[in-house]
């Protein structure tokens, strides 16, 4: 099992409310200030702001459309404006396969679209929050490793 090292610097982009997933999926430390501790140089991190801002991501990628064999290039819309994220659903194996956000609207749980794919036999975790309005979400690929970083901001 890989060792996990604490690397906290007030000037870094991580801060107290960060959650870093690394390959392989290591120990999760769940507390009010959710975080997984691992050393990653800040130069490998590029943040995508999601949550209440309703902006598009800035990274370009290729994904498969609903049509047979259609490949589409472009940005993904983060249309969560005005909603409070209450849950994050994470499917993982050796790496994180998908992330999906949940919102409470009129007492009912409403799910966002799934970001990523899921394979049969994947593990599944649900992270519940109260009053989370903004999430900074990052996906980095470096030397064959897939890194996911989520930074939470309470309202």
Curated annotation (Swiss-Prot):
Transmembrane is among the record's keywords: yes
One MF annotation (Gene Ontology) recorded for this entry: carbohydrate binding
Segments traversing the membrane: 26-48, 127-149
GO CC annotation: membrane
Compartment(s) where it occurs, according to its Swiss-Prot or TrEMBL record: Membrane
Membrane topology value: Multi-pass membrane protein
Every Jacalin-type lectin domain range: 47-155
InterPro entries linked: Jacalin-like_lectin_dom, Jacalin-like_lectin_dom_sf
Chief location bin: membrane
UniProt xrefs under Gene3D superfamilies: Jacalin-like lectin domain
This protein's UniProt keywords: Lectin, Membrane, Transmembrane, Transmembrane helix
Keyword Transmembrane helix: yes
Superkingdom of origin organism: Eukaryota
Family under the similarity heading: Belongs to the jacalin lectin family.
Protein name (database record): Probable jacalin-related lectin 26
Origin species: Arabidopsis thaliana
Lineage: Eukaryota, Viridiplantae, Streptophyta, Embryophyta, Tracheophyta
């Amino acid at each position: 099992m890989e060792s996990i090292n604490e690397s906290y610097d007030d000037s870094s982009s991580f801060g107290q409310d960060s959650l870093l997933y690394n390959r392989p999926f290591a120990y999760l430390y769940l507390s009010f200030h959710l975080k997984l501790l691992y050393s990653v140089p800040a130069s490998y991190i590029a943040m995508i702001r999601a949550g209440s801002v309703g902006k598009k991501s800035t990274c370009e990628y290729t994904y498969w459309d609903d049509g047979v064999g259609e490949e589409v290039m472009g940005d993904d819309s983060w249309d969560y404006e005005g909603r409070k994220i209450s849950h994050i659903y994470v499917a993982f194996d050796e790496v994180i396969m998908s992330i999906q956000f949940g919102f409470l609207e009129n007492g009912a749980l409403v799910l966002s679209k799934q970001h990523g794919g899921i394979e049969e036999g994947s593990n599944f975790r649900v992270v519940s929050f109260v009053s989370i309005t903004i999430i900074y979400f990052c996906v980095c690929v470096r030397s064959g490793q897939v890194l996911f970083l989520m930074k939470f901001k309470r309202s």
